[in-house]
């Protein structure tokens, strides 16, 4: 039996070598997409609906291909960068307000993950009291329905009347580029179940939605685009919608528009005003298309502005 220790060592080493030669499986799924921050005693939860690759080289204008590539490279991104689709929940202690609803079924597997991530964050979609849409576009309003039924059955859906009048009227197809005309059918598909359920309640901005939450006009990207200003406990959070699509480009160069803008000149003017105010006031920003969680601040830079993301807090402060 004096050879037993040697034999055991050889067996163990052989097993170890076999284990090393077996390929390790990899997992593609990320952790549940939610992140919390505090606004006084109100809680803000950023919730991911997914990410989608956007061909900015075909969509941003005016900018040269060389300049676009250089701007994106400064952020270590390709010109067809994978872009976040972010939504946000405001918990006032009495109400749950969802700002934007993601893409629902309209972006395939790239979007539509909002309900599962809400549940992962401990938020039941049926407990949402109000859905505030920054505007009507697939990746913001598409998630209000699934299979012809409201995803948030107990919520009133609120959006500026000017977007309702525009996107639910096919006659306005002549007012947009051909590549945008699919938005009219998507808008009808998304909002019709909400309308039929008597849950759509439009407004005209500027207006107070409820104490502490105001809708501020931000037209240009769409006729009824708004920013939601949340003010509580001496702090302010601005929920931007589509003020920014490609922050490595549009922060240093706010004059760069995107082909999705219904009125590019107005969209640029809105962005310039919003960025200047955000940098001046130092308010918190919740951005739909800046890398998840899309929370941070805007600061002046040598050229235009720069994005400063929120510092990660395990306590959600």
Which residues does each PLM region occupy?
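Active-site metal-binding loops of divalent metal-dependent hydrolases
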Residues: 49-50, 101-104, 136, 162-163, ...
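N-terminal signal peptide c-region/cleavage motif recognized by signal peptidases
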Residues: 13-16
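Short, conserved loop/helix-junction motifs that constitute active-site signature segments
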Residues: 148-154
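Bacterial N-terminal signal peptides that target proteins for export
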Residues: 1-7
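Metallo-beta-lactamase
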Residues: 19-115, 119-123, 127-141, 234-241, ...
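Cap/insert and terminal regions of metallo-dependent hydrolase folds
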Residues: 108, 227-229, 233-317
């Amino acid at each position: 039996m004096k050879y037993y220790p040697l034999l055991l060592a050889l067996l163990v080493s052989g097993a170890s070598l076999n284990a090393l030669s077996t390929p390790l499986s990899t997992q593609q799924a990320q952790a549940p997409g939610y992140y919390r921050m505090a606004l006084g005693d109100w809680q803000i939860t950023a919730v991911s609906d997914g990410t989608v690759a956007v061909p900015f080289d075909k969509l941003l204008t005016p900018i040269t291909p060389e300049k676009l590539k250089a701007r994106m490279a400064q952020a270590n991104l390709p010109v067809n960068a994978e872009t976040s689709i972010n939504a946000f929940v405001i918990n006032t202690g009495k109400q749950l307000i969802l700002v934007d609803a993601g893409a629902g079924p309209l972006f395939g597997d790239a979007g539509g993950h909002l309900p599962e991530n809400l549940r992962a964050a401990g938020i039941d979609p049926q407990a949402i009291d109000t859905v505030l849409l920054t505007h009507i576009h697939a990746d913001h309003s598409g998630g209000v329905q699934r299979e012809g039924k409201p995803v948030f059955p107990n919520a009133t859906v609120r959006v500026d009347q000017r977007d309702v009048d525009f996107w639910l009227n096919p006659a306005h197809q002549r007012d947009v580029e051909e590549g945008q005309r699919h938005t009219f059918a998507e808008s009808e598909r998304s909002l019709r179940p909400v309308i039929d359920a008597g849950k759509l309640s439009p407004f005209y901005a500027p207006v107070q939605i409820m104490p502490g939450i105001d809708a501020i006009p931000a037209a240009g990207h769409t006729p009824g685009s708004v920013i939601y200003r949340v003010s509580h406990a001496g702090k302010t959070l601005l929920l931007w919608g589509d003020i920014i699509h490609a922050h490595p480009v549009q922060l240093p160069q706010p004059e760069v528009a995107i082909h999705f803008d219904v009125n590019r000149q107005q969209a640029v003017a809105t962005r310039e005003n919003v960025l200047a105010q955000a940098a001046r006031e130092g308010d918190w920003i919740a951005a739909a298309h800046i890398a998840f969680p899309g929370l941070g601040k805007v600061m002046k830079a040598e050229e235009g502005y720069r994005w400063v993301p929120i510092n990660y807090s395990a306590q959600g402060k």
